[in-house]
Amino acid sequence: MNEAEHSVEHPPVQGSHVEGGVVEHPDAKDFGSAAALPADPTWFKHAVFYEVLVRAFFDASADGSGDLRGLIDRLDYLQWLGIDCIWLPPFYDSPLRDGGYDIRDFYKVLPEFGTVDDFVALVDAAHRRGIRIITDLVMNHTSESHPWFQESRRDPDGPYGDYYVWSDTSERYTDARIIFVDTEESNWSFDPVRRQFYWHRFFSHQPDLNYDNPAVQEAMIDVIRFWLGLGIDGFRLDAVPYLFEREGTNCENLPETHAFLKRVRKVVDDEFPGRVLLAEANQWPGDVVEYFGDPNTGGDECHMAFHFPLMPRIFMAVRRESRFPISEIIAQTPPIPDMAQWGIFLRNHDELTLEMVTDEERDYMYAEYAKDPRMKANVGIRRRLAPLLDNDRNQIELFTALLLSLPGSPVLYYGDEIGMGDVIWLGDRDGVRIPMQWTPDRNAGFSTANPGRLYLPPSQDPVYGYQAVNVEAQRDTSTSLLNFTRTMLAVRRRHPAFAVGAFQELGGSNPSVLAYVRQVAGDDGDTVLCVNNLSRFPQPIELDLQQWTNYTPVELTGHVEFPRIGQVPYLLTLPGHGFYWFQLTTHEVGAPPTCGGERRL
């Protein structure tokens, strides 16, 4: 293990500070930098991402909250699992009124998590294991306690007076929707110090930055340079559609936003090649595709973007036992530039958002997946994957197979690989942000602190609680969900078609079965056939596979040969919520690869 994982040799620089009315920030040169991974401009296309909350993963300091040193301690587990990149939500200094998305200092780590030096040690330790790290960057707004905002409200004519969107009236930009409809009545709030209204698309304690001010643009680019200079592999850009405001528009997806993102991309490409920008834009695919930029250049804005509308439709398709919700949203998704990639997910740290569905579809999802009102949050459902699926192992495996085989780079949420549950009586989104369940011991093996000091209580549910569901028990059980997930990740890694293959839906005779081919062309190409039964009952399917006549389907987890494809429709029968992954090959089949020395099914 590298020395950086154990010790910090010099005192940390303590973030930003105000001096003479000017906010001074540290420089990346004040710190060490992490070991670099080999340059690969397309690494993100092949990567499996793993979202982990620093606070929730492991507590190395025994104070009741997870920390950066705790995450370093658990990197060997993530390497064993087989993920390629860690996504860290905000770990910056914050009042924590919105889970860290209310940033008080972009240049400082929240003290209970550690220091910037600890963060550099984390990136270095991850890189030495072949794991990359991207972090959240909240570009749209700050906390009201950020020194930029405090100086802006104190001195309207000072250097920060125009850092935020101020107005004498709250009647501007009236066409902009209110995003947090369950807590906010307006996008404007009155500041008693400056005696003006300030604009906020999210909570009232999160004032929006004014990107019409060139100084704000430069300040954010400086933040980007700082963290990339320390060695991280990219950013998830939070809430990017809302950076600019214009009268007569909904203040989303504006041309000015795209122009600024092109500036950011150029800085990244010129100064930090191989780093990645991932857009969080909860919009329809036709709008989101614009965040990739110019297709004639391969894309000149963000390298990746989340495909939000796909996620609820996976849940809808399985509950309705019909492929059409998935088929239709994929058909509505425009082509993307050659150097771009979708990010797809089942669950994350927020609610299962239902913004990108119709009112009728939203009512259906609430009725099916959120029967208790406490399961709802804003316009969505605050539940983890396993409880959403009633802890049905077949459904969980089917959803995992869809996540790993549909177009895009998959994002796993910490704990879903073992089937963790949630605690719905906790407020806001905390119910899906509980401590990772490592062992059946006290505090789920997450912390040695007194249980009363934990940032949130672990689940003690008889089905999902840590005594029943934990890494220690599942790691030693070959048939566990954890080992199933690990095996599927290993299979995916061996076949580039899953990462970069073209997508061709096959239709078929049965609407309850979703079948598609992922294919990389060429002499060294790779063709994978994926067949998914969305019904709880066994289903037959006849597929037209004539273009692969004389190919042999080889099932990928067991390496079993199925009958050769001929001119007639190819008949398969799938168990309820079952799936197949086949490689279509004309070559002689060899011995199956193994995962970790043994083949786990």
Swiss-Prot record:
<dbReference type="GO" id="GO:0005977">
    <property type="term" value="P:glycogen metabolic process"/>
</dbReference>
<feature type="binding site">
    <location>
        <position position="208"/>
    </location>
    <ligand>
        <name>Ca(2+)</name>
    </ligand>
</feature>
<dbReference type="InterPro" id="IPR017853">
    <property type="entry name" value="Glycoside_hydrolase_SF"/>
</dbReference>
<feature type="binding site">
    <location>
        <position position="242"/>
    </location>
    <ligand>
        <name>Ca(2+)</name>
    </ligand>
</feature>
<dbReference type="GO" id="GO:0005829">
    <property type="term" value="C:cytosol"/>
</dbReference>
<feature type="binding site">
    <location>
        <position position="236"/>
    </location>
    <ligand>
        <name>substrate</name>
    </ligand>
</feature>
<dbReference type="GO" id="GO:0005886">
    <property type="term" value="C:plasma membrane"/>
</dbReference>
<feature type="binding site">
    <location>
        <position position="245"/>
    </location>
    <ligand>
        <name>Ca(2+)</name>
    </ligand>
</feature>
<keyword id="KW-0479">Metal-binding</keyword>
<feature type="binding site">
    <location>
        <position position="206"/>
    </location>
    <ligand>
        <name>substrate</name>
    </ligand>
</feature>
<comment type="similarity">
    <text>Belongs to the glycosyl hydrolase 13 family. TreS subfamily.</text>
</comment>
<dbReference type="InterPro" id="IPR032091">
    <property type="entry name" value="Malt_amylase-like_C"/>
</dbReference>
<feature type="binding site">
    <location>
        <position position="141"/>
    </location>
    <ligand>
        <name>substrate</name>
    </ligand>
</feature>
<dbReference type="GO" id="GO:0047471">
    <property type="term" value="F:maltose alpha-D-glucosyltransferase activity"/>
</dbReference>
<keyword id="KW-0378">Hydrolase</keyword>
<dbReference type="Pfam" id="PF16657">
    <property type="entry name" value="Malt_amylase_C"/>
</dbReference>
<feature type="binding site">
    <location>
        <position position="349"/>
    </location>
    <ligand>
        <name>substrate</name>
    </ligand>
</feature>
<dbReference type="GO" id="GO:0005978">
    <property type="term" value="P:glycogen biosynthetic process"/>
</dbReference>
<protein>
    <recommendedName>
        <fullName>Trehalose synthase/amylase TreS</fullName>
        <ecNumber>3.2.1.1</ecNumber>
        <ecNumber>5.4.99.16</ecNumber>
    </recommendedName>
</protein>
<comment type="subunit">
    <text>Homohexamer.</text>
</comment>
<dbReference type="GO" id="GO:0005991">
    <property type="term" value="P:trehalose metabolic process"/>
</dbReference>
<feature type="binding site">
    <location>
        <position position="243"/>
    </location>
    <ligand>
        <name>Ca(2+)</name>
    </ligand>
</feature>
<keyword id="KW-0413">Isomerase</keyword>
<keyword id="KW-0624">Polysaccharide degradation</keyword>
<dbReference type="GO" id="GO:0005509">
    <property type="term" value="F:calcium ion binding"/>
</dbReference>
<comment type="pathway">
    <text>Glycan biosynthesis; glycogen biosynthesis.</text>
</comment>
<keyword id="KW-0326">Glycosidase</keyword>
<feature type="active site" description="Nucleophile">
    <location>
        <position position="238"/>
    </location>
</feature>
<dbReference type="GO" id="GO:0016161">
    <property type="term" value="F:beta-amylase activity"/>
</dbReference>
<keyword id="KW-0321">Glycogen metabolism</keyword>
<keyword id="KW-0972">Capsule biogenesis/degradation</keyword>
<dbReference type="InterPro" id="IPR012810">
    <property type="entry name" value="TreS/a-amylase_N"/>
</dbReference>
<comment type="function">
    <text>Catalyzes the reversible interconversion of maltose and trehalose by transglucosylation. Also displays amylase activity, catalyzing the endohydrolysis of (1-&gt;4)-alpha-D-glucosidic linkages in glycogen and maltooligosaccharides such as maltoheptaose, to produce maltose which then can be converted to trehalose. TreS plays a key role in the utilization of trehalose for the production of glycogen and alpha-glucan via the TreS-Pep2 branch involved in the biosynthesis of maltose-1-phosphate (M1P). Might also function as a sensor and/or regulator of trehalose levels within the cell.</text>
</comment>
<keyword id="KW-0119">Carbohydrate metabolism</keyword>
<keyword id="KW-0106">Calcium</keyword>
<dbReference type="GO" id="GO:0005992">
    <property type="term" value="P:trehalose biosynthetic process"/>
</dbReference>
<comment type="pathway">
    <text>Capsule biogenesis; capsule polysaccharide biosynthesis.</text>
</comment>
<keyword id="KW-0320">Glycogen biosynthesis</keyword>
<dbReference type="GO" id="GO:0004556">
    <property type="term" value="F:alpha-amylase activity"/>
</dbReference>
<feature type="active site" description="Proton donor">
    <location>
        <position position="280"/>
    </location>
</feature>
<feature type="region of interest" description="Disordered">
    <location>
        <begin position="1"/>
        <end position="21"/>
    </location>
</feature>
<dbReference type="InterPro" id="IPR006047">
    <property type="entry name" value="Glyco_hydro_13_cat_dom"/>
</dbReference>
